[in-house]
Amino acid sequence: KLWYNINIMKNFKTFLSEAEGKGLTMFDVDETMFITKAKVKVVKDGKVIKKLDNQEFNTYKKKAGEEYDFGEFKNAEVFNRTSTPIARMINKVKAILKNAVRAGSKVIIVTARPNFDNKKLFLDTFRNQGIDIDKIYVERAGNLGGGPAADNKKVIFRKYLDQKIYKRIRLFDDARSNLKAFLSLQKDYPGVSFEAFLAKPNGSVSRVR
């Protein structure tokens, strides 16, 4: 009888977790998990006319004849050496990852950067903070072209939503433009719960609706 009751309880718990569905949590990197130093150069007619930090790059719209130079943005050595971890957010990532993996949910990173020139060194920056980066896939929105970061990230958000396996999806990002792009997808996926969190420099967050 006891064995039967335990089995019923187990089945009920399984049912509850399936009813809630799987969750997807997405983290930005620059100014969300780490304070970073790399800049994107804006080049016109072979000359560097501007240098954009991460936050400026998020909202910059290229003008005619301008190209981006991602040299610093791709440099894993610069990222590894100069990035300062934001402790509260790093702890949040670790806690969410631990719970997510246990519950069958997923955690990914969505960065505005393209591929790094040294993948191992880039990933070691996370390992050095105790983050099990091998359980987190890193989506590099910078590979999708020279458009605004929010547009590129939106393509990635949609890719995961189109898998139709997530009932809850949340984003931690320091750029309102990225959070706005994320929330704009709600109308296309009415069966999914969206949560957007604005990351502050001290690692605290506030919900954006």
What are these regions, as identified by a protein language model?
Residues 168-170, 176-209:
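Asp-based, Mg2+/Mn2+-dependent phosphohydrolase catalytic module
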Residues 23, 153-176, 182:
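Conserved Lys-Pro-Asp/Glu-containing loop-to-beta segment of HAD-superfamily phosphomonoesterases
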Residues 10-20:
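Proteolytic processing junctions in secreted/extracellular precursors
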Residues 123-132, 158-164, 183-192:
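Short, surface-exposed basic-aromatic patches at helix termini and helix-loop junctions that form
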Residues 1-5, 18:
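Short, positively charged and aromatic/hydrophobic N-terminal segments
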Residues 20-147:
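Alpha-helical substrate-recognition element adjacent to the catalytic core
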Residues 119-123, 154, 179:
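Short, surface-exposed alpha-helical segments at coil->helix boundaries
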Residues 92-96, 156, 181-185:
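A short acidic, amphipathic alpha-helical/loop segment
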